[in-house]
Amino acid sequence: MYFLTPILVAILCILVVWIFKNADRSMEKKKGEARTRAEARPWVDEDLKDSSDLHQAEEDADEWQESEENVEHIPFSHTHYPEKEMVKRSREFYELLNKRRSVRFISNEQVPMEVIDNVIRTAGTAPSGAHTEPWTFVVVKDPDVKHKIRKIIEGEEEINYMKRMGHRWVTDLKKLRTNWIKEYLDTAPILILIFKQVHGFVANGKKKVHYYNEISVSIACGILLAALQNAGLVTVTTTPLNCGPRLRVLLGRPAHEKLLMLLPVGYPSKEAMVPDLKRKPLDQIMVMV
C-alpha cells in the first residue's frame, strides 16, 4: 500500500496544476472578451471615468497643470438704469422668456448661420469655475449626420421607454404626448449638441482642472435658450439617455468631452402644437428672507 503513495501524490499534483491552468485560461478568455468589447466600443471605458472630483488633480499631480497665470484687472464699466427703466426692461425680458415653449414640431426652413454664431457667442459669456469655459458647442447641419444622430437616439429611447425609465416616468410623459420618435432631429435645420469638458489640456500636454464643469455648462445652456428665444427661434431640450458616448464618437469629439444636452433649432412648423401648461406663480418659486 505504501509504494502507491508517491503515485497518488503525483496524481494530486498534476490535478492541482491542471485546475490552475484551466482557471488561468478562463481568466485570459474573459480578459480577451473584455478587450474585444472595449475595442468594439472604444468610448465606454473612457466615458465611465467622467468625474468632476475636485481632488483628482491632487492625486495625480504629475498629470495636472497648476495655474500660474496672472490675470490683469481693469476698471468695470456699468450702465445704471433709472428705476422705471429697470422695471420696464425686466418686465419686457420676462414677457419674452415667458413665451418660450418646448417645440417638437420644427420646420425645415433654413436659419441664418450668423444668428447661430451670435447665440452661441452669447452662451459663451456664461460664468464658469475659475473661468475655464468648459464647453463645446457642436453645430450639425449635414442631413446625413442628423439622420445618424436620430437613429442612435431613437434606438436607445425606445429601450428607455420600454425598460429603463419605469412606469411612473413614462406615465408622466404621456400627458405631454412625447415618445421615442424624434422626427425633429431630421427636420430641424440645425442641431446643437452641447458637450461639457471634464478637464482641459495646456500647451505642455498636462491636464487642466475644470471646476464645476457640469454646473458651468448648464448655465451656458440656459443662456443659449434665452438667446434662441430672443432671436425668434424655437427648440426643445433633449438629454439623450445612454446615447452620449456613441454621439461623441460619431461627431469625433475627444474622450474628455461628455454630451450634456442636444437642441434642435429652427422655426416652428405651421402645424406646431404645444401643451397648455401653466407656470408656477412667483409666491411658489421665491422665498423672501
UniProtKB/Swiss-Prot annotation:
Recorded GO CC terms: cytoplasmic vesicle membrane; plasma membrane
EC number(s) stated in the UniProt entry for this protein: 1.21.1.1
Biological process terms in GO annotation: thyroid hormone metabolic process; tyrosine metabolic process
Cofactors required: FMN
Positions with a binding annotation for FMN: 100-104, 128-129, 237-239, 279
CDD domains recorded: iodotyrosine_dehalogenase
Domain of life: Eukaryota
Membrane topology: Single-pass membrane protein
Residue stretches of biased makeup (Basic and acidic residues): 47-58
Catalytic reaction(s) noted: 2 iodide + L-tyrosine + 2 NADP(+) = 3,5-diiodo-L-tyrosine + 2 NADPH + H(+); iodide + L-tyrosine + NADP(+) = 3-iodo-L-tyrosine + NADPH; 3-iodo-L-tyrosine + iodide + NADP(+) = 3,5-diiodo-L-tyrosine + NADPH + H(+); L-tyrosine + chloride + NADP(+) = 3-chloro-L-tyrosine + NADPH
Coiled-coil portions: none
Keywords from the UniProt entry: Cell membrane, Cytoplasmic vesicle, Flavoprotein, FMN, Membrane, NADP, Oxidoreductase, Transmembrane, Transmembrane helix
Family the entry assigns: Belongs to the nitroreductase family.
Functional description taken from the UniProt entry: Catalyzes the dehalogenation of halotyrosines such as 3-bromo-L-tyrosine, 3-chloro-L-tyrosine, 3-iodo-L-tyrosine and 3,5-diiodo-L-tyrosine. During thyroid hormone biosynthesis, facilitates iodide salvage by catalysing the oxidative NADPH-dependent deiodination of the halogenated by-products of thyroid hormone production, monoiodotyrosine (L-MIT) and diiodotyrosine (L-DIT). The scavanged iodide can then reenter the hormone-producing pathways. Acts more efficiently on 3-iodo-L-tyrosine than 3,5-diiodo-L-tyrosine.
Protein name according to UniProt: Iodotyrosine deiodinase 1
Naturally occurring in which organism (per UniProt): Pongo abelii
Underlying gene: IYD
